[in-house]
Amino acid sequence: MAPETDYTRKFRKELMAGLSSLVLLAVLARAGREMYGYEIAKAVKAEGEGGLIFKQGAIYPVLRSLNTSGLLDSRVEASAFGPPRRYYNITSEGLKALNDWQGAWKDMREFVDDALLAGGMKHDYQPSA
């Protein structure tokens, strides 16, 4: 596979910036229990190749933002090994947001799929040799 171009990397970054909150809420809702940051990062990675788009350190600002917005609760607990851990749990407001965002994502995905598939591609990309 050819190396990714700068504009593709930029596109992925912008796309993931908008979707990271949705994914993190979904992971916590599916877990049904509180999780600390590294656990959440491992769960995202376990979702498949898409998890590779997330850099582990990049989830922490999103978790803090979701917490500040009231979509997550958090608490800090001392750890037997290493620094204290911050545990996150989805709130009822977070579950409502997740439900709303899933609907918005479904609508957006259908719109984009329709735009990409409508009438087929008029120009095919031909990579240079």
Stretches with model-predicted labels:
Residues 13-58:
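N-terminal helix-turn-helix DNA-binding core of bacterial DNA-binding proteins
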